[in-house]
Amino acid sequence: MRLFLLVALYLSPVYGDYTDEWIDPSDMLNYDAASGKMKNKPQVESTQSYYSVENTVSQDATQQPAQKANELHQNPDMTCSAEYQEYKTKLENLKGQLEETKRMEKSKSKSQAIFKRYLNKILIEAGRIGLPDESYPKAHYDAEVVFTMEMLQEIQSFLNNGDWNVGALDDALSSTLVQFKHHNEEEWKWKFEDSFGVDVYTLFMLILCVLCLVKLIATEIWTHIGWFTQLKRLLILSTVISFGWNWMYLYKVAFAERQAELAKLQDFDKCSQKISWSESLFDWMKGAATFQNDPCEDYFKALIVSPTLMVPPTKALALTFTNFITEPLKHIGKGIGEFLNALLSEIPLFFQVPVLIFIAVLLLAFFYGAGTAVMNPVNLYRRLTGPEREKPLPVEPTRSNRKRFIEDVRVPPALGQLPRDNDVVNIPKQQPLDDIDGSNNPPVTAPADPSDTGQVKSNNTGEPLVQEDHSIKKSIKESRNDERPNTESPEAKPQRPEEPVVETLRST
């Protein structure tokens, strides 16, 4: 009995379950102060490494079984040491890979938290000025980016997979984007106006006018077009532009008046309702007694009538010509008023009347001199011959039927009778000015027979001729210087010249 108890007491400490209550004082890295126990990660890591090594060994064993067996047969001690070194190297590589994987997972989790905070900050800053929604699906913001040397180093170390600090990188990203605001497309125009003191459109129009003047002078167009023609065209162009300008101004004014009338009118609902005969009679009596327009009529008139119809072109044209005359006079009168106010403010009242008379005389003299200086070149220009006045006048008036001739229809005197003074006999034919070689001569006709007295001959076209009056005969007679045959004896006969004796006159 005593022997049995001794054996039981001896075996009781040996039997029992293994627990993790034991604390290794030499391994403080794996000690968990919160739980007061040792961590199990090293054992898990060793187990994983053991299994990984075992797997690699099994793979090597399956890949090269024959080679391993031969090496074990030849040198068993060397084979064991070589395998140990190989397994040890693989174990170290696996430990390094495991640590690298853990470090990457840890850094990945930290970087995700950093970027979540960074994106959250962007949304908060953009939400202060408005985020996109259904009515405004796209938003354009402006922000400033700020960098320092420390921020740049942290960001570069993070991108290069180096050692980086979570807090430093978070502060760097949080301080990068500042001053969120909406993008303004016309901000550059304001900066331009602040820098140069002029609007962009005004500067563009000024440059365009300067370029037009340079082109006008450089291409010598002004030498071919007169100044009065250019001034006339400029006035016409200004009138056309002013017409469109004034029409747009009147349209805007009419539109503003219409909107003001619509804003003043109230109780629109009663205009769409039907009224009884008593209400209609009451409204008619009210309008007849007070001479006020019907508010519903004013409402529908303002609602239906377009402002475009309220501004006809004649109204814009009348305003254009009115402004063309009155606007310069307004500015001239304003300038004269300011001049007289400044001039007469320091002059006593007694001397103001002579000063005004003197100024009036000076103005009259100035306008007279200016008018004379302007009209003298105009009159000189009118006296000068221009391109349209250089056409030479004809030497003699031309006739439409130059090549048509008229035969002499007068009857020659009978034998033994002298011709009368008003008769012209055997006058040589007058050759036309343009007929030098005689190509336009009419056909020769036989002299008139005395028996044909009283007959009227015709020209080559067969049309009857009319006898010319005495004045034309007289002028022809004087121009020929009495070239008549000698008729002293009664028996003298008219001599036939070398040319035909038939009298031919140019038709009128």
From Swiss-Prot:
Topological category with respect to the lipid bilayer: Multi-pass membrane protein
Organism: Xenopus laevis (African clawed frog)
Primary location group: endoplasmic reticulum
Protein name as catalogued: Chloride channel CLIC-like protein 1
Domain of life: Eukaryota
Signal peptide location: 1-16
Biased composition (Polar residues): 452-462
Gene name in the database record: clcc1
Region (Disordered): 388-508
Biased composition range(s): Basic and acidic residues: 467-499
Keywords (A to Z) from UniProt: Chloride, Chloride channel, Endoplasmic reticulum, Golgi apparatus, Ion channel, Ion transport, Membrane, Nucleus, Signal, Transmembrane, Transmembrane helix, Transport
